[in-house]
Amino acid sequence: MLVDLDQPGETAAWLGGTAISIKADIARNEGWAHVAEEVDRTFGRADIVVNNAGIYPRALIDDLDFDLWRKTLAVNLDAHFLSAKHFVPRMRKNSWGRFVNISSNAIGMSVDGLSHYMASKMGVIGFVRGLANDVGPYGITVNAILPAITNTPGTRGVSDEDKKAFWQLQAIKRLAEPEDIVGPVAFLTSDDAQFMTGQAVVVDGGLYKVS
């Protein structure tokens, strides 16, 4: 089930496949309550949650007001907490569950105008590690993926020049595509990764290795 605030149907079509899409605000508790109800009604159980929503508004500290700070943390971090509040109890009933939370390799970089974004994505790592301890006894794993900047609708606002500045630092000299991230996500949701939890998996074309 694909959840989006704006046009989930368009995103589902862009991704392809047979995804069911619903509209909800994942930065609010009410949004996740709606998602959980729809999952119960449609599937009868919840096994896997991938927290992939995020915003990337750039602003230097002089231009960064509290509203933008809070909006960034609400979408990029609060949503991960809310997903756990609604779906951990459902997964616990089945003694099995997988959370994959998307952070960013930007947390290890120095980039102007992204202090709020980096704070939110670093927070994801801390939350993943803490939650993994809480839910591990119930057969639930929690991991994070730190991707490079990726060619998705969410990065359309990033200039080609800025994108190139990132990927030129990588060992693999190109922009990441969604397909590059799908494989690691699928692995972390599988039984093959049942002994991995609380981990931050970097999928960034080798940027950390060479910088």
Segments from the language model and where they lie:
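Short C-terminal tail/terminal secondary-structure segment
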Residues: 109, 186, 197-211
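Alpha-helical segment proximal to the catalytic Tyr-Lys
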Residues: 89, 133-134, 194
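Short-chain dehydrogenase/reductase
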Residues: 1-43, 57, 68
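Substrate-binding pocket helix/loop in short-chain dehydrogenase/reductase
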Residues: 60-61, 68-73, 155, 166
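Short, small/polar-rich loop/turn modules that mediate ligand/substrate recognition or access, typified
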Residues: 136, 141, 196-198
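Active-site helix of classical SDR
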Residues: 84, 120, 128
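A conserved structural motif in NAD(P)-dependent oxidoreductases
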Residues: 170-181, 192
